[in-house]
């Protein structure tokens, strides 16, 4: 109750004060790294959904945001560390949305049988700054699937548990937020996650700047 009372009386000051605490930055770290871990450990390794080129780029951008949160959380009151956190956070969110838009267009082309729309999907990724992440951590960053096709492909020699079989059947038509309705594919869901993160970061950043001007 005290939080909402302070937010109502001085919204700019309250939002600005949040970023001086580690909690908000740790939330960003947990959220973004958590999504990557779920994508890798659950969907890739457990349900056998092979990641495509754009998928591993999305993982990269999420980890960039997580890194920004880690750096800012070291000392949130340190201006330099906070600026680095913001730069990495905004950068990760922006390129992440761009990757999502690209993946969504490929997904649409694949499922509409438009051969001219299926472009931008390679087995040899090119990460920003020339980082050879696919060589450093191939299980995490080497694309082994085709863009737009994210349905499970179970190896012939694998025996599935009943829970694995349930997941495989559940996502047999590909990853959707609501598979039975084919509602919101993975690219669209990730875009929303990035957009929400960007809006929150932007609001925090503006409130911080306004607070500095008050001082």
From Swiss-Prot:
Name the UniProt record assigns to this protein: Putative protein-disulfide oxidoreductase DsbI
Native source species: Campylobacter fetus subsp. fetus (strain 82-40)
Pfam families named in the record: DsbB (PF02600)
NCBIfam families per the UniProt record, alphabetical: PRK04307.1
Subunit structure and binding partners: Interacts with DsbL.
Transmembrane segments: 23-43, 56-75, 79-99, 190-210
The protein's role, per its UniProt record: Required for disulfide bond formation in some proteins. Part of a redox system composed of DsbI and DsbL that mediates formation of an essential disulfide bond in AssT.
GO cellular component terms attached to this protein's record: plasma membrane
Nucleus among keywords: no
Coiled coil (residue ranges): none
Gene Ontology MF term list: protein-disulfide reductase activity
Subcellular location: Cell inner membrane
Main localization (coarse): membrane
Annotated keywords: Cell inner membrane, Cell membrane, Disulfide bond, Electron transport, Membrane, Oxidoreductase, Redox-active center, Transmembrane, Transmembrane helix, Transport
Disulphide-bridged cysteine pairs: 52-55, 121-147
A biological process term (GO) from this entry: protein folding
Keyword Magnesium included in the entry's annotation: no
Underlying gene: dsbI
Protein family (similarity comment): Belongs to the DsbB family. DsbI subfamily.
Membrane topology, record value: Multi-pass membrane protein
The organism's place on the tree of life at top rank: Bacteria
């Amino acid at each position: 109750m005290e939080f909402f009372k302070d937010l109502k009386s001085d919204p700019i000051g309250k939002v600005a004060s949040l970023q001086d605490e580690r909690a908000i930055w740790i939330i960003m770290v947990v959220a973004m790294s958590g999504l990557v871990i779920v994508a890798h450990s659950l969907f890739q390794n457990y349900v056998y959904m092979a990641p495509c080129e754009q998928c591993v780029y999305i993982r990269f951008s999420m980890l960039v945001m997580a890194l920004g949160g880690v750096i800012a959380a070291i000392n949130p009151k340190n201006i330099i560390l906070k600026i680095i956190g913001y730069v990495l956070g905004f950068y990760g969110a922006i390129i992440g949305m761009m990757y999502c838009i690209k993946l969504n267009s490929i997904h649409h082309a694949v499922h509409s049988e438009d051969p001219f729309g299926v472009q931008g999907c390679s087995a040899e990724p090119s990460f920003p700054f020339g980082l050879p992440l696919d060589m450093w951590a191939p299980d995490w960053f080497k694309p082994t699937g085709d863009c737009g096709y994210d349905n499970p492909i179970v190896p012939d020699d694998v025996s599935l548990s009943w829970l694995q079989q349930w997941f495989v059947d559940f996502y047999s038509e590909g990853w959707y937020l609501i598979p039975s309705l084919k509602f919101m594919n993975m690219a669209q869901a990730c875009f929303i996650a990035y957009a929400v993160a960007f809006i929150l970061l932007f609001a925090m950043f503006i409130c911080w700047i306004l607070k500095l001007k008050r001082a």
